[in-house]
Amino acid sequence: MARIMMKKAHNESISEAFEGFMLSAQSRGLTDKTLASYRTHFHSISKRLDIEKPISQLTKKDLEEMIAKMREENLTDTSINSYTRTLKVFFSWRNEERIL
């Protein structure tokens, strides 16, 4: 099956990009539990990362600062690892779709 390439606007926010990720995840048939987990994780991430920032301007430093905030708030390593794992899946999807 041919892949449909869609060009994304350079000013797409992290939040908008995540909604695209969720739509794709839903269309691929991921379980409701997985989708709910992604949403919960993104909600937590959004408390520590400016999700209205254009995704094209997201830097490694932004992510490191987010993780540092989580550590300052005494989140467990398990929680932090869960949130970063969700971000890794999100970024992998963006890369696979060639929209990073």
Feature annotation, model-predicted:
Residues A2-M5, E19-K33, R39-L100:
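N-terminal core-binding DNA-recognition domain of tyrosine recombinases/integrases
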Residues M6-S15:
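A detector for short, charged/polar N-terminal pre-domain segments
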